[in-house]
Amino acid sequence: MISQERLLKVILAPHISEKSTVCAENDNTVVFRVAIDATKAEIKAAVAQLFEVEVDSVRTLVNKGKTKRTGARMGRRVDWKKAYVTLAAGAEIDFVGAE
């Protein structure tokens, strides 16, 4: 069993983009930014508990940080992890929070 404290640290934010909007409309898939060390099992448990929905599958990928120039120095942005969470048929997550 995963601790409640860990579940709250796994999901960082929803990832909003054109592709994530298309996935949400067509495939019932929601995209989240997650902790870099989060596993698929932790992501599935966190989404199921926090949003009270049934999760079918989780796909993850790590985006490598880009190299950026700041003046004469070269810096690097941090790596981050993205998770595509497919919800069960009929399940839905509303981020707008309409009343």
Curated annotation (Swiss-Prot):
The scientific name of the source species is Shewanella woodyi (strain ATCC 51908 / MS32)
Q: Which family does it belong to?
A: Belongs to the universal ribosomal protein uL23 family.
Q: Which UniProt keywords apply?
A: Ribonucleoprotein, Ribosomal protein, RNA-binding, rRNA-binding
SUPFAM superfamilies according to UniProt: Ribosomal proteins S24e, L23 and L15e
Annotated GO biological process: translation
GO cellular component terms, alphabetically, are: ribonucleoprotein complex; ribosome
Q: Name one GO molecular function term.
A: structural constituent of ribosome
Specify the superkingdom: Bacteria
Stored Pfam families: Ribosomal_L23
Subunit structure, interactors included: Part of the 50S ribosomal subunit. Contacts protein L29, and trigger factor when it is bound to the ribosome.
List the InterPro entries: Nucleotide-bd_a/b_plait_sf, Ribosomal_uL23-like, Ribosomal_uL23/eL15/eS24_sf, Ribosomal_uL23_CS
The UniProt function text for this chain reads: One of the early assembly proteins it binds 23S rRNA. One of the proteins that surrounds the polypeptide exit tunnel on the outside of the ribosome. Forms the main docking site for trigger factor binding to the ribosome.
- Name the Gene3D superfamilies on file: 3.30.70.330
Name used for this protein in its record: Large ribosomal subunit protein uL23
Q: Which HAMAP family match?
A: Ribosomal_uL23_B (MF_01369_B)
